[in-house]
């Protein structure tokens, strides 16, 4: 395994399931996530980007511990309405949201069912913004405007960077809370559990990816 340090991040390059991989923790927020993704593409020539993490549920049917696999992602805090753009639309971009790779999404859903059969898996839009959503008003806004299933702080930036570079991507989120400030278990406990599930899930996806 080789470790590369750049932009205050550590990139671990090696082999998993017979595939060359680079594992990195981007840090919190959209800027960190976008920088991390661009480094993966520029320096490590990533052919696929898979991001795992946690998110808050925006759907009454999606409970803590469930998994949301992205169909597409959007910036819920992007607002250029004054210039004639709809909420969420990035000015001068041809995409309103960034669509995940269909093949990766199908692999992930199947892998979730096989690796964690007791965990519910949902496919839907994930909304990202540079804020931790614990306010009902913000939650209602994101649901009404975008119909998102989950909300977090990095996914859309990763998706945008990958989209601009024509690199297939997927975002997978374990639900840690209801995006209303509530939680059924303490965060460190959930984080450890989610990390273990994400690792097993990623291994299975890697095993099934062709090439």
Model segments located where?
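N-terminal short beta-loop-beta anion/metal-coordinating cradle
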Residues: 1-44
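Active-site-proximal beta-strand elements of phosphoester/diester hydrolases
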Residues: 22-26, 125-127, 172
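A C-terminal functional module that forms or caps the active site or interfaces directly
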Residues: 132-178
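Proline-aspartate-enriched helix->loop->beta-strand connector
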Residues: 45-50
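His/Asp/Glu-rich mid-to-C-terminal helical/loop segments that flank catalytic regions of hydrolases
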Residues: 179-211
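Alpha-helix C-terminal capping segments
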Residues: 39-43, 61-62, 160-168
């Amino acid at each position: 395994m080789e470790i590369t340090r750049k932009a205050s991040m550590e990139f671990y390059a090696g082999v998993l399931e017979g595939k060359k991989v680079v594992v990195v923790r981007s840090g919190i927020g959209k800027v960190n996530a976008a920088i991390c993704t661009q480094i993966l593409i520029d320096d490590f020539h990533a052919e696929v980007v898979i991001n795992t993490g946690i998110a808050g549920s925006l759907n009454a049917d999606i409970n803590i511990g469930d998994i949301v696999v992205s169909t597409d992602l959007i910036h819920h805090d992007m607002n250029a309405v004054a210039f004639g753009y709809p909420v969420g639309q990035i000015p001068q971009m041809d995409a309103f949201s960034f669509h995940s790779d269909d093949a990766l999404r199908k692999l992930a859903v199947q892998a979730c069912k096989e690796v964690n059969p007791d965990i519910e898996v949902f496919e839907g839009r994930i909304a990202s913004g540079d804020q931790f959503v614990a306010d009902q008003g913000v939650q209602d806004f994101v649901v009404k405007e975008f119909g998102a299933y989950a909300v977090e702080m990095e996914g859309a930036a990763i998706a945008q960077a990958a989209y601009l570079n024509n690199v297939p991507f997927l975002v997978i989120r374990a639900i840690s809370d209801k995006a209303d400030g509530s939680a059924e278990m303490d965060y460190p406990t959930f984080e450890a559990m989610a990390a273990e599930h994400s690792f097993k899930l990623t291994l299975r996806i890697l095993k099934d990816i062709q090439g």
